[in-house]
Amino acid sequence: MKFGLTSVALGLSLAIGANIAAGLTKEKSKPPVPFTEEYLASDSNISAGSAIWADQCRHCHGAKAYPGKAPKLRPNRYKPNFVYRRVTDGFRKMPAWIDVYTDEERMQIVAYILSKQFSP
């Protein structure tokens, strides 16, 4: 009986440890398809991203990312995958939007943020 309880305890410890380790080594979020110049320059993608920004993001970031509750964005310093990861996974006080917006919608937000229409 003692051997059985020890085995169960060891098994549970290993399972819990594996779950913790999996959370610590979470893979970075990637868009379902690579960002292309054409995608980022598409008027329909920029327009859709602008609508999402106006509906959701501006409440913290402001109309064009400044002034708002959140820090000022500097889109000319960002790469598309970096912005996508921030929108998808969140960062510090910014919530993750992975369960709210589709992959395509999050990609459209990126297109808008990196567009000339967005830049403050």
List the model feature ranges, each with a label.
Residues 1-5:
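Positively charged n-region of N-terminal signal peptides that target proteins for export
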Residues 9-17:
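Bacterial N-terminal signal peptides
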Residues 23-26, 87, 99-120:
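C-terminal capping alpha-helices of c-type cytochrome domains
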Residues 24-52, 120:
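Electrostatic cytochrome c docking/interface patches
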Residues 31-38, 63-66, 77, 103, ...:
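Mature soluble domains of exported/periplasmic/lumenal proteins and thiol-rich metal-chelating peptides
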Residues 39-50, 62-93:
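Gly/Gly-Pro-rich "capping" loops immediately C-terminal to redox-active cysteine motifs
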Residues 49, 53-63, 109-113:
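The canonical Cys-X-X-Cys-His
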Residues 60, 96-97:
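Thr-Gly-centered strand-to-loop micro-motif
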